[in-house]
Amino acid sequence: GSDPTSDPVLMKRGLVAGIDYEKIQSPNIVCFHGSAHALLMLSDVRPEARMFIAPLAETLAGRAHWTPVCGFEDEVTDAIIDGDDLYLLVNRNAPRGRLVKTSAAAPRLADAAEVVPQGRTVLESIARARDGIYLLILDGGISRLRKLGAAGHGADIALPHGADSALPHGADIALPHVADIALP
């Protein structure tokens, strides 16, 4: 490998005009396999993030023109890019979460299509795997895993008794892990 001191700096405080953030906030640039876009997530101790998007090629070249996606006030807690689609997990006016979709090339949260409406369960996180999009759902304290299908309908994936689920971004599959619990 190369010397890390020669790596380009893609984001830091004061590097890009218009993208200011507090000392407590940290930038994270996320890329998704097969997407031509990169997502910049600014986060702190809140579950919500402030997000921007830019073409991946421009980002890697160090000349990204970041387009705003959402602010902290929009209460977006998770996001993935699937091809040309940007999926956002939104809690604003939906405390149990809802999943919306907008264009990655020209995101408009206000006009995003609702993919999964708020329901009786809590949408905790989303992840993209090779075979689709997965939702981690909390149902009365029990974790559930659902693979998103056409028109927002999903297929529940049975987890072994005592299993929780982890949703690593970009994995080939969503992997369950067994929690340490006492069984009666």
Where are these regions (language model features)?
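Peripheral, non-catalytic segments that deliver or gate enzyme domains
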Residues: 1-184
